[in-house]
Amino acid sequence: MEMTKNDLKNKLTSPEEAVKLVHDHDRVFIGLVSNITPVLSDALWERRHELNDITIISGLLLRPTRLYTELAENQPFKMLSLFLGPFERTAMKIGRPSAFTSLHLSQVDDWFHNIGKVSVVFISASMPDENGNVSFGVSGGSVYRFLLDTADRIILELNPNMPYVYGQDNIFNINDADAIVMSDKAIPEMAEGEPDEITEKISNQIVPLIPDGATIQLGIGGLSSAIGSKLTDKNDLGIFSEMLCPSMVKLMKNGNVTNKYKGFMDGKSVYAFAAGDKAMYDFMDHNENIYNAYFSFANDPRMIMKNKKMISINTAMAINLYGETAADAIGYHQYSAIGGQLDYVRGAQWSEGGKSIIAMDSSYIKNGKRYSKINFTFPEGTPISTPRSDIEYVATEYGCIDLKHLTMADRVRAMISLAHPDFRDELTEKARHVDLI
């Protein structure tokens, strides 16, 4: 059934009118990553003196919102985040009433259905096609469908800059919205970062572990860029990943990614959320080889394991001598979230020919002093992201070692060998003092 001009006209309203659908005590989802709703969010901020007890739910926003970055006397907004990014951390720093929920991304649908039910969902979407269907864009397919199952009110923020992306139930008809507003904001970008000398050394340790025909999972940052640049001589790679990033798209454009031999969803680059530059977003638009999936699908270890030669590459903030990772918090300071690290660590190892790799610099420098990221023990309060029973390969600029099934003593020795030379003697002495080696 073709959309008529009246279908859109009847739903179209001003942002100021649309946010009048938000009532006291509502829980409002405003977006995640690149799928955020700046027009609706700013309009909601303007109602700060009219409303009471509003919970704003989001995750890893790539654009600031006044709901998080500004405070006002007696303002009603509380933040609930599933994944802390720079703007969520700003909200906590300036004193915005805030809460954080720690969960594996594979559990997001269960959380929204049973615990985190929303009253109102703001949806950032593409322009409608001839049938009145919009796409949830570059990242919305990861969560929007769960929200629609429970939300009382649905408000679309249509944007001609948002790519029309295919995927797992990634389409929504405008007639099912309660209100529609327009936006012309650019889709927020995330720079991948240039690899430095240490990152190049780490990538050199990892690339030999990636064979032709492997299915890869990468994140964003200099390491992904370095690895991606070294995979241009590989053939028939596949993508099944929590995140789609520019280095992956470059491999797709270059013909290194064909998705022919994954053994699961062949022909499709499957991902949950995307963050990159405009060139990447343009490539995603109406690209039938790209598939935006639910978090509960793309991060389900039982789905991940179906991909042959699944190579999962994740990072950590610190690793202890057992090989346990601290990826989202140090001490009592929450920095980000566990995301899908453990989902992919397990799924990759269950895959036929798969491998899980945790990679990081061995040390960092702060105020002119060097500190080890390989720790004897973590600071008090540090949560474990990947436990020692799940860890497999660990890579630093000093090597890459498979820890799986090693004795504790051999594991400790291996981790010390991956540390910066300045700290190896100290780590060895501490390990001997408690009879670890």
Predicted regions and their residues:
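Conserved alpha/beta enzyme-core scaffold
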Residues: 1-437
